[in-house]
From Swiss-Prot:
The gene is RR21. One of its GO terms (cellular component) is nucleus. GO terms for biological process: cytokinin-activated signaling pathway; phosphorelay signal transduction system. Keywords: Activator, Cytokinin signaling pathway, DNA-binding, Nucleus, Phosphoprotein, Transcription, Transcription regulation, Two-component regulatory system. Belongs to the ARR family. Type-B subfamily. One of its GO terms (molecular function) is DNA binding. InterPro entries: ARR-like, CheY-like_superfamily, Homeodomain-like_sf, Myb_dom, Myb_dom_plants, Response_reg_B-typ_pln, SANT/Myb, Sig_transdc_resp-reg_receiver. Its main location: nucleus. Residues 616-628 have a biased composition (Low complexity). It comes from the Eukaryota. This is Two-component response regulator ORR21. It comes from Oryza sativa subsp. indica (Rice). It is found in: Nucleus. Residues 17-132 form the Response regulatory domain. Residues 139-204, 616-647 are annotated as: Disordered.
Amino acid sequence: MAPVEDGGGVEFPVGMKVLVVDDDPTCLAVLKRMLLECRYDATTCSQATRALTMLRENRRGFDVIISDVHMPDMDGFRLLELVGLEMDLPVIMMSADSRTDIVMKGIKHGACDYLIKPVRMEELKNIWQHVIRKKFNENKEHEHSGSLDDTDRTRPTNNDNEYASSANDGAEGSWKSQKKKRDKDDDDGELESGDPSSTSKKPRVVWSVELHQQFVNAVNHLGIDKAVPKKILELMNVPGLTRENVASHLQKFRLYLKRIAQHHAGIANPFCPPASSGKVGSLGGLDFQALAASGQIPPQALAALQDELLGRPTNSLVLPGRDQSSLRLAAVKGNKPHGEREIAFGQPIYKCQNNAYGAFPQSSPAVGGMPSFSAWPNNKLGMADSTGTLGGMSNSQNSNIVLHELQQQPDAMLSGTLHSLDVKPSGIVMPSQSLNTFSASEGLSPNQNTLMIPAQSSGFLAAMPPSMKHEPVLATSQPSSSLLGGIDLVNQASTSQPLISAHGGGNLSGLVNRNPNVVPSQGISTFHTPNNPYLVSPNSMGVGSKQPPGVLKTENSDALNHSYGYLGGSNPPMDSGLLSSQSKNTQFGLLGQDDITGSWSPLPNVDSYGNTVGLSHPGSSSSSFQSSNVALGKLPDQGRGKNHGFVGKGTCIPSRFAVDEIESPTNNLSHSIGSSGDIMSPDIFGFSGQM
């Protein structure tokens, strides 16, 4: 391509200033002669450090630099980097090493060309193209920046129009990316008229860590949406920094933030699964959605209820009992058709830590016109279970559960005082109404599916804690003046039925019960039976009287299976000999099958022969048990999640374990007696099972 003349008539590249750096003096001399033949103004230097000093002293003194790759004082690539950062001049590398990786390294470091020694004259004649290309791009950049400055002067200063600067910045950034590609292109282009050496040169801006931090601080001060290059430049106040530099850096910064946001948005959070779409309707006449909308149920409680009813385990349901209205379930009353099952949920209502003490609220208002709950007295519950159960139930996840409130019914008022309860897995402990003289100084220890229901106004006094294991049920019957065990009382498939007032008969076999479910707690005045032998079912408990000392006598060879016990006066011997037929004694203790953890203290109303087993408490009016032969029912062993807990007449306390039982009709209280003297009604005494 022919040389171009400028406006003054001087041919280009005549007089182009070239700096040659090489540690070989012979090579320097040859190159200088060849450059002079090309009519260039050549300057030679044998040290890279010296050449760098010359460039720093006179940045405008040279148009292009030719440097060797391998030099003793400084590597040619290092010199290339420093010149590109500080002076922004085109640099041509030369070396006898023609390996591709070395040539590629020079190109990556920003070299305009790579000459292989020995350098030919034709190559030196065309080095002026790199100077023209460099200055041509700088002229276009300068013109573009001038148009942006004019736009800034004519643009209104309101906030809405400030966003237009960002669009211009984007256009400028795309233009600069195209410019960088053209810099690497070795093809010749059309040259414009004019002297390129007369145009101004702008140094390249290096965004160091400190400079970038100032930029970020300015953007944060203005806000990412309101940050524009002009304001950022004013806040940074860095000499030599132009608005174009800030605009380009701002565009890159916004693209970076956008990529980060998209990356985080695409990652699903494994700790926050999507909320369940299931809805909780009404249960027992209680609309959970309405309660949640009115603020009576916390949202987290409603979510936990949804998970529970959908069959998913939940361990975080917390319903505080002091400052918020508690969740209540309506009493399940009336007859149930065959096959209709109780709906119960029993995930943790109040979750506590092991061995924690919690005070129960004294009262709580009713919700939605439903029967309210009577609160437990403000006494402390001591936990001594290794699994960390609290207050009664242990679910499949071994969660700690406290029954905050129990339902208040006329027949089962919760007003007793329990000082200490040691509750084992799957146990429900419920005091009965008017528990005047029921006192446990050391606490009761129900264990494994135990339902402990003291009688109403029974005058029940316990000085030492009994141990009730393997699913026993301790209960008494409805108030009656005298119960003469003269006839066979047979019960079949009855659940939660009150006992009859009184029955009289001959000296027959006594009470018979097999597989009872629930014996309601209603209080008792006296029990009296003759000295006839009695039958005790395999799942029963009995109270013995007038028997030889330390033994349980059954004259009719009635089998006494496991899970039984007797109420008596004083501490019994703690061995298996108590269950054999021996001589006579009148005082018995409450026994379990496996071991005895406590005993009953001597009672003041026991005579020397055991005709009267009186239970009384000083300073209170109480009744007494006269004679024994009283069968006490036992819950059937149905495994976890099978047992009902009932208080009073048909009142159901929902629990985790009331899921699969079928409730029998509870209103038909027929008391008909067959020809054989047996009571034929299946709904007497609250026993469940078949003869």
